[in-house]
Amino acid sequence: MVNSIHLEPRQHCRGTVTLPGSKSIANRALLMAALCQTPVILHNLLVSDDTSRMREALNALGVSFEDDKLITRVNGLGGGWNKPASELYLGNAGTAMRPLIAVLAATLKNEHQAVVLKGDARMHERPVKHLIDAIQPRGAGVNYLGETGFPPLEMTSGLKPGDFEIDGSVSSQFISALLMALPLLPGDSTLTLKGNVVSRPYIELTLQMLSDFGISIKEDSPQCYAIPGGQCYQSPGEYWVEGDASAASYWMAAALLGKGPVEIIGVGKNSIQGDKRFAEVIEAMGASVSYRKNSMTVSGTGSVQGIDQDFNDIPDAAMTVAPLALFANKPTTIRNVANWRVKETDRLHAMATELRKLGATVDEGEDFLRIEPLKHWRHIAIDTYDDHRMAMCFSLVAFSSAGVTINDPGCCAKTYPDYFSEFSRLCHS
C-alpha cells in the first residue's frame, strides 16, 4: 500500500470524468433489494470498502449476489433471513451499520436469532444512541457489548409498530434507517423528528428510493411521517445507481481552480442527491456551471470568491469549501456542520488542524469553521485520519505554488478507489 502521494503544483484541470456510483444510493439499494422477494438488477454499483461491508453482511444473512461486469443481481429474501450469521462486521460503514440496526430489529424472528453488529475502532466511537433510544421503547432487543451508546451491540427481535420519536440533529442516517425499517412492521407507525434536522436531502433521497421500491410513506409535515405497516419491498426489476454527487464536488472545485472545462458525468439536473446543490455553491465562489440531464460542465477563472454559508443540508460536500477558502479573495465561513464531528473522524477538528499546518488562520467553533485566505504557501504532508474526504479535499492544495503530499491516499477506497489516478489524468501543470 502507498503510504503517501506527492502532488506537484497544478495549474490546469480539464477533461471528462465519470463519477463512481454513489455510496449513499448503493448501500440503500443493496439493502432494499435484499428486502425484495424477487431479484433486482443493480447497474453502476459502487465497488468500495463501504459497499463491500454491506454486501458481506447481507450475504451472511442469506442474500446471494451475481456479478456480471457492471451489473449486480441481488436475490433478496423479503426480510426473512436464512439462518443469519451470529456476527456481522461492518468496518467503518455508517451507511451499513445504522440501517441494519433498525431493519434487523424489525425482521429478526425470535430472541434466539441474535446478531452482533461490530466494526472497526472508529465505528465503535460513532454514536448510535439516538437510534437505539428510538427503538428500545417499542420493544427492540438491543444489548450494548462495549460503551453504552456505541457499537458493538447485539440485536434481537421485538420491534413493535407505534409512535416513534428521534432527534434529527445528529445524523440523518438514523432517520433513514427507521424509514426503511418501519414499513416492515405488522401495524402502522408514525415517526416524529425532533430538533433541527441535519442533512435533510438524504432523507428525501431515502423517501424517493423507498417509493421506487414500492414502499408508501406519507409526509404529514417536514417533522412527521405516517408509515403504513405490513408493506413488502417490491423489485423495480432494474435500478440505476447515480454517480456520487459528493465526489462531484472535488471536480467542480478543481475546475474552478484549474479553469476547466471539466465535464462531470453521472450527476446532473435530474439527480435525486442533495449534494448536487454544491453546484450552486461553486457558482457563488466564481465558477460557471452548465447542466444537462445526467451531467454538468464546470469552468472557472482561477479566481475564488470567499463565502459565508449555512451547510446543514449538504455537510459532506461542504468539506470541499475548506481548502478552496485558502485561495479566496476574502475569509470564508462554513456554518452549521456540527455533525462533521461524528463522521469518519472529527472532521471539524481534523480539517482545522491540517489547514493550520499549511499556515492558515482558522477559527474552529462547535459547528463552524472560519478560514482566512493563505498568502504564503509551503509544501507539507497532510494527514488524512483514515477519512476519504480529507484526502480528496486536500488534493486541491496541489493548485497552489507549493503542491502537497497526501498521507494514506488509500483511504479513498471507501468511496472512490480511483480518485488519485483520475486527478493525475485531469489536473496538470
UniProtKB/Swiss-Prot annotation:
Active site: residue positions: 316 (proton acceptor)
InterPro entries: Enolpyruvate_Tfrase_dom (IPR001986), Enolpyruvate_Tfrase_sf (IPR036968), EPSP_synthase (IPR006264), EPSP_synthase_CS (IPR023193), RNA3'P_cycl/enolpyr_Trfase_a/b (IPR013792)
Catalytic activity: 3-phosphoshikimate + phosphoenolpyruvate = 5-O-(1-carboxyvinyl)-3-phosphoshikimate + phosphate
EC number(s) given by UniProt: 2.5.1.19
Gene Ontology BP term (one): aromatic amino acid family biosynthetic process
Presence of keyword NADP: no
Molecular functions (GO terms): 3-phosphoshikimate 1-carboxyvinyltransferase activity
Record's subcellular location: Cytoplasm
Recorded GO CC terms: cytoplasm
Subunit structure: Monomer.
UniProt-listed HAMAP family: EPSP_synth
Protein name from the UniProt record: 3-phosphoshikimate 1-carboxyvinyltransferase
Gene behind the chain: aroA
